[in-house]
Swiss-Prot record:
Subunit structure: Homodimer.
EC number: 4.1.99.12
SUPFAM superfamilies per record: YrdC/RibB
Positions that bind Mg(2+) 2: E38, H153
Protein name: 3,4-dihydroxy-2-butanone 4-phosphate synthase
Pathway: Cofactor biosynthesis; riboflavin biosynthesis; 2-hydroxy-3-oxobutyl phosphate from D-ribulose 5-phosphate: step 1/1
HAMAP family on file: RibB
Function: Catalyzes the conversion of D-ribulose 5-phosphate to formate and 3,4-dihydroxy-2-butanone 4-phosphate.
Binding, D-ribulose 5-phosphate: R37, E38, D42, R150, R151, G152, H153, T154, E174
PANTHER family assigned: 3,4-DIHYDROXY-2-BUTANONE 4-PHOSPHATE SYNTHASE, GTP CYCLOHYDROLASE II-RELATED
Protein family according to the UniProt entry: Belongs to the DHBP synthase family.
Cofactor(s) required, per the database record: Mg(2+); Mn(2+)
Length: 217
């Protein structure tokens, strides 16, 4: 069923290219994983172009758990420890402690405040002292090697930013249904069509990167 629903958004490589173009233009995309994994669709926006309106959309239409996806280098730069020392989550989701911008926010939970926090954490010269802990933005550590190593939304978001030539920081949040349940591919597709957003699967991204690597070699 996944492929039949996805084909309305083009062939696999076209879906990736459409997602890259949208991100370069400051827009968001929806990324779906495998039916046998989380079977969820996530909003993905670039930290670089993130707006308050986009953050508000994630809070309003999603789970409200907005995460900033970063590679190991930025995690070290900000001195962000993992949320737990012994990760027992089903998909080994690598949460860091939560963060807040030290300046420019009030309570930290509004859409504008969360954008301020993300901008502070992803600034070129960002320092640990720029952030308070805990806060209202969840950090996620992407595995080195991206989706070829771990087929998660975290890695997919960072890989997409790199393919788009943007700073390697993705902002993600799970899309939910009006009743609060998780949106599966049929609902993700419906939302994408209504809001003119590209949809791409993590498997599409794996295929795209593998083909690109083969061309280089």
């Amino acid at each position: 069923m996944i492929q039949s629903l996805l084909t309305q958004f083009g062939e696999p490589l076209t879906r990736v290219e459409n997602a890259i173009t949208a991100l370069q233009q400051g827009q968001g995309v929806l990324v779906v994983d495998d039916e046998n994994r989380e079977n969820e669709g996530d909003f993905v926006f670039s930290a670089e172009h993130l707006t308050t309106a986009q953050m508000a959309e994630m809070i309003r239409e999603g789970s409200g758990i907005v995460c900033l996806c970063m590679g190991e280098e930025r995690i070290k730069q900000l001195d962000l420890p993992q949320m737990v020392t012994h990760n027992t989550s089903q998909n080994n989701t690598a949460y860091t402690i939560t963060i807040e911008a030290k300046e420019g926010v009030t309570t930290g939970v509004s859409a504008a405040d969360r954008v301020t926090t993300i901008k502070a954490a992803t600034a070129d010269n960002a320092k640990p002292e720029d952030l308070s802990r805990p806060g209202h933005v969840f950090g996620l550590k992407a595995k080195t090697g991206g989706v070829l190593v771990r087929r998660g939304h975290t890695e997919a978001s960072v890989d997409l930013m790199q393919l788009a030539g943007l700073k390697p920081f993705g902002v993600i949040c799970e899309l939910t249904n009006p009743d609060g349940s998780m949106a599966r591919l049929p609902e993700v597709s419906g939302y994408a069509n209504k809001h003119n957003m590209p949809v791409v699967s993590i498997e599409d991204l794996v295929q795209y990167i593998q083909i690109a690597q083969q061309k280089v070699s």
